[in-house]
Design a protein with these regions (language model features):
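Conserved acetyl-CoA-binding loop-helix of GNAT-fold acetyltransferases
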Residues: 83, 89-102
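Extreme N-terminal starter segment of soluble prokaryotic enzymes
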Residues: 2-3
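Conserved active-site alpha-helix within GNAT-family acetyltransferase domains
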Residues: 94, 106, 110-112, 116-137
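Charged catalytic carboxylate motif
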Residues: 11-14, 95
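Acetyl-CoA-dependent GNAT
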Residues: 6-10, 17, 21-73, 79, ...
Length: 145
């Protein structure tokens, strides 16, 4: 049975492995990951949860809540979601997204948004609609290490 629970510092190695496997834009630097993981767990506007089966982490979601003028209140953004290959097609992604949506609702978020390259059909299946193009700019001194 898979459970979704808040991430803990003890999950750092398994979440790092998932993040490193799924990163498409950056190489995940271990020292930077460790710092960011700890910050994310303690940041009140962030949500980090893991999917666990038989004491093994097979997925995670990282997201944030913040105010937005256009939404007349708070919005929530899924920054990262990853599910290990052996955990796919078992509802784990849906469970992680559902848990994030519950958290977002509890924070007063009026919408949940995300960007994806790999799973557009999955998000459409769970009620998301395509809304905008996604642009990014790597800031000077912070290339994709």
């Amino acid at each position: 049975m898979t459970i979704i629970r808040p991430a803990e510092m003890g999950d750092i190695n398994e979440v790092y492995s998932l993040a490193a496997d799924f990163a498409t834009s950056f190489d995940v630097d271990r020292a930077a990951f460790n710092k960011t993981f700890g910050e994310s767990l303690s940041e009140p506007n962030s949500y980090v949860a893991v999917a666990e089966t038989q004491n093994r982490v097979g997925g995670y979601v990282l997201g944030f809540s913040h105010p937005a003028f256009y939404a007349n209140g708070h919005v929530a953004w899924v920054e990262e979601i990853a599910v290990e290959e052996s955990f796919r097609r078992q509802g784990v992604g849906r469970m992680l997204m559902s848990a994030f949506e519950e958290w977002a609702t509890s924070r007063g978020a009026r919408l949940v948004a995300l960007a994806t390259r790999r799973a557009a059909s999955f998000y459409k299946e769970i009620g998301y609609e395509e809304s905008a193009l996604y642009f990014r700019k790597i800031m000077q001194g912070h290339d994709n290490d």
